[in-house]
């Protein structure tokens, strides 16, 4: 399913004709350029590889520069892939823009969540605090028991404990496209999308729409 790569600009709000305020995230989608078309015969699957944005020439490695030059496109800030479904065809060097979503109502947005560093179980996993008084000392925000006794004699994998939070790939599904601004290459998406301002996001038609 083909999508687009954009950059999160921030949040604002727009008003309907009835005066209802709608919170929206603004995603800037510069032209997505096709750098490679992968086929079942040569690569084992059908997909297109795209890039977007710009990158200083002295920041592009020689192999990457050769790859972009072969495709006849300007070097971008990264490379992404989208699997192709039967019947979809794209040419190397072709450009994709926000008009791809003119007929799309709902989208899934993928990004890298904001990093929160090392966090305890209350913030990280929404645990409840223990008693603030009633004889409790130094265990107000502690997780409590993390297992049993000699049997099984270990902590099970996946146990929710304190640790690094955020800075991971997150997808928010079924977000509504409120407006497509082709003139300024903007998508206005209802609600919040993952990541910090300036972060890359992948916008695809919703799989559950």
From Swiss-Prot:
The record's section on PROSITE patterns has: RIBOSOMAL_L3 (PS00474)
PTM notes = Methylated by PrmB.
GO CC: one term? cytosolic large ribosomal subunit
GO MF terms listed in the record are: rRNA binding; structural constituent of ribosome
Keyword rRNA processing belongs to the record:
no
Q: Which UniProt keywords apply?
A: Methylation, Ribonucleoprotein, Ribosomal protein, RNA-binding, rRNA-binding
What superkingdom heads the lineage?
Answer: Bacteria
Tell me where in this chain the PTM N5-methylglutamine is found: 150
A Gene Ontology biological process term:
translation
PANTHER family recorded: 50S RIBOSOMAL PROTEIN L3 (PTHR11229), LARGE RIBOSOMAL SUBUNIT PROTEIN UL3C (PTHR11229:SF16)
Similarity remark: Belongs to the universal ribosomal protein uL3 family.
**Assembly and interaction partners:** Part of the 50S ribosomal subunit. Forms a cluster with proteins L14 and L19.
Described function:
One of the primary rRNA binding proteins, it binds directly near the 3'-end of the 23S rRNA, where it nucleates assembly of the 50S subunit.
| NCBIfam families, per the entry | L3_bact (TIGR03625)
What is the protein name for this chain?
Large ribosomal subunit protein uL3
Q: Which organism's genome codes for this protein?
A: Photobacterium profundum (strain SS9)
The primary gene name is rplC
């Amino acid at each position: 399913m083909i999508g687009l790569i954009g950059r999160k600009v921030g949040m604002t709000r727009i008003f309907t004709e009835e005066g209802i305020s709608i919170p929206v995230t603004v995603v800037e989608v510069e032209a997505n350029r096709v750098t490679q078309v992968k086929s079942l015969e040569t690569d084992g699957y059908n997909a297109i590889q795209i890039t977007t944005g710009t990158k200083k020439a002295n920041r592009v490695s020689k192999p990457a520069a050769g790859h972009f030059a072969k495709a006849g496109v300007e070097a971008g800030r990264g490379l992404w892939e989208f699997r192709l479904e039967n019947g979809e065809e794209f040419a190397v060097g072709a450009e994709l823009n926000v008009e791809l979503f003119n007929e799309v109502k709902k989208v899934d947005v993928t990004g890298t969540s904001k990093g929160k560093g090392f966090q305890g179980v209350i913030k990280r996993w929404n645990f409840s605090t223990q008693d603030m008084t009633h004889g409790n000392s130094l265990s107000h925000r502690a997780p409590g028991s993390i297992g049993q006794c000699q049997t099984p004699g270990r902590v099970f994998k996946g146990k929710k404990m304190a640790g690094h939070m955020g800075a991971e790939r997150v997808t928010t599904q079924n977000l509504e496209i409120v407006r497509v601004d082709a003139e300024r290459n903007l998508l206005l998406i209802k609600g919040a999308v993952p990541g910090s301002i300036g972060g890359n996001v992948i916008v695809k038609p919703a799989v559950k729409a």
